[in-house]
Structure formats: structure tokens, C-alpha cells
Amino acid sequence: MSLPHSIRLAAGSGPTFGVDDLACAAATHLGCWEDEGLAVTWTPALGGIAAMKKVLAGEVDAAYGGLGPVLQLRAAGEKLRIVASMARALAQNLVVQPHIADTGQLRDSSWAVDGIGALSHHMARCIVSSLGLDEERIDWRVVGPPPERIARLLAGEVDASLIRVEEALALTNDPANDLKMLLGFAELKQLVAVQPHGVLVTTEAFERINPEVLSKLARGIITASRRLRDDFDGFVQTYEYYVSVSLPAADIERIWAQECASEGFAINGELTPDHWQRQIASFAALNPHLPSVTREAVIADQFVREALADLGRRAGPDRGPAG
């Protein structure tokens, strides 16, 4: 069936999706965007910075990636705009080599990240800052999305890396290696209360010319987030189709329950002023050398507001107002 509207999206997660970006997968797999009359084609990108560069180069119309690259590029003068959040936090765990016994031993360690400024690097910097460690003593190794980071861990080439929750479970439960989980989901949530997360991003030019397409994009991602939150079967269906890591059913249900309990699903599109002022303040504290970015400049909240006016606001921390 030919749909009346189409959009090209870059995926900063590369060729795979995980729990931390499952809303994008669900919007495609569960037909949420199709129900809006929107045909979506995905282009893999090796990290959020690469995804945003594809948007700026005109190779795609919009992208999914971490909020850090968006703020970084916006500070540099690039006219990027956030259309909606696809999560409210980062569903990853910190996996380390066996010689790392505690967080103090992360000092002088090597970390595998997807890119400088990208999501795993942004969150890693938040962790290092919260632990009171000197970031200058961390050896950041740019290797790419989770599969590449896992490969470096298994090869013993790096000391630590943030890995998707499902991949971390499978990895640390595998007797074939001696990697361990130093900080799990709940511990990271306590350590870093304001966590960077994924967003859908476009350019000011595309926003100006294609408002109807972006309205459909926002409605679809909100609907997908709600279906993941409300329907465990839909979560499992999307997980099993897109996520390459096989886990026992009990572990998948535990991950879903964890996401629900932590209110990680962006069931109202999470563009609320308080959330974003805290995100921008956290980013500015990590990057004091960059020009300041305002919420009004970087966020196109009209599409989420329109979607919520039609779909209704759900109870939750991102209930609003969104603008």
C-alpha cells in the first residue's frame, strides 16, 4: 500500500535496535507510523554524531540519536530541532573487565564509546562527573555502536563500556567470558538522575516545509511509547523482531517492568520545560566552553503539543505542559 507521506530517518544506533531505542522500532514494527499514513525508511549511522551529519547533509530528513550531539551541533550554529523524545533515560549498564573491582578503579581506565559527544560518551561523562573522577584521566576509545563496543570488551582492548541492558545481561551471564556488570540500570539511575536519551531530530528547513510529516512522526512515536508501556506482548513482539540478543522470557519481562517502574517510556513525548532545562543545564556543565543553547531554540514542541491535544495526555512525569 502506498502511503501519502514519507520520511527518511537515520538511526544513530547503527543497524540494530535495543531496549534504549525500542520506541523507534515499535513505531515501525507495530505500524504506528503506518497508521498515521507515514512511510519510514531507515538508514543506519554509526553513532548520533554521524546520524545528525546525515541530516545536515540532506541524506535523510530526520534522525534518531542522543540529545548531546543535537545540543553540541546547535551550539555550533547548526539549525537542528528536536521533534520528540523517544525515551526519558538511557537503558544501559556499565560493563567492565574483571580487574575493575569498584568505581574508584575506573580512574585511568579506557572506555569504548560510539563517538565523542555521542550518547554513550555523553552518559559516560555524566557517570565520571558524578563519581568525582578526573575526566582528563579517562582514555576514551571511539569504536562505534554497541556491537563494536562489546567486541572490544571481549577482546580485552578496553576496560569499560556502557552496553544496552539486554546485551549486558547476556554478556555478563555468559560463562565463556569473565566480564562483569559494575553498575546496573537502577544504580546508574541513582547515580545520574538526569540522563541523556534519544530524540527525533530534523532541520529548521524541513520543519518549515513539512509540518504535516513531523506531526505524524510525533504522533507515531508517542503511540509507540504508549503501546510499549501498556502492552507487554507488544514489547516482546518488537523485542524479538529487532533485538539480536536472546534472553529468557523472565529477563525480558524484568527489563520491561524496570522500564515501566522508572518511567522511562516517553508516553507524552517528553518535551516538558523542567526536564529540558535540567538536560540543557547538565550538558552546559559538561561543556562550559560551548555557547549556550536555549530550549526554545532547539525544541520544536508544537508537534508534540498537537499530538497530545488529539491523543490526550497520560499521567506521568512528562504529562506537561509541553510548551
What are these regions (language model features)?
Residues E148, V158-S244:
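Pocket-lining segment of extracytoplasmic ligand-binding domains
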Residues A25, L71-R74, R125, L169, ...:
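Predominant activation on well-ordered alpha-helical scaffold segments within soluble catalytic domains
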Residues I209-L290:
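Secondary-structure end/capping motifs
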Residues G14, S85, Q190-L191, L271-T272:
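Short Gly/Pro-enriched turn/cap motifs at secondary-structure boundaries
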Residues I150-L153:
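Rossmann-fold dinucleotide-binding core
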Residues I280-G323:
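Conserved C-terminal helix/tail region of periplasmic/extracytoplasmic solute-binding proteins
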Residues G48, T103, P146-P147, F232, ...:
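Residues at or immediately preceding the N-termini of alpha-helices
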Residues S2-E136, W140-V143, A155-V165, D178-F185:
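Short, glycine-/small- and polar/acidic-enriched structural segments
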